[in-house]
Amino acid sequence: MMKLTCVLIIAVLFLTACQLTTAETRDEYRAVRSSDEVQNSRSTDDCSTAGCKNVPCCEGLVCTGPSQGPVCQPLA
């Protein structure tokens, strides 16, 4: 019984280590990234690539359309 417990603990530790090493390249494991990387990914949330009524358009886009539903479009 003790050997089985040890094997299970080692397996869990190994799988956790595998997830942490691949977490740097995957977006699905954001919780394990450093706080700087998370802040950098959040900085892109300050602009919009779609509607621009409440959030300004991202760089390279301009807000056009009626006041009820303006959208972000590429600069011409």
UniProtKB/Swiss-Prot annotation:
Expressed by the venom duct. InterPro entries: Conotoxin (IPR004214). Keywords: Disulfide bond, Knottin, Neurotoxin, Secreted, Signal, Toxin. Residues 29-49 are annotated as: Disordered. Disulfide bonds join C47-C58, C52-C63, C57-C72. It comes from the Eukaryota. GO terms for cellular component: extracellular region. One of its GO terms (molecular function) is toxin activity. It is found in: Secreted. Residues 24-42 form a propeptide. Residues 1-23 form the signal peptide. The presence of a 'disulfide through disulfide knot' structurally defines this protein as a knottin. The cysteine framework is VI/VII (C-C-CC-C-C). Belongs to the conotoxin O1 superfamily. This is Conotoxin VnMKLT2-013. It comes from Conus ventricosus. The lineage of its organism: Eukaryota, Metazoa, Spiralia, Lophotrochozoa, Mollusca.
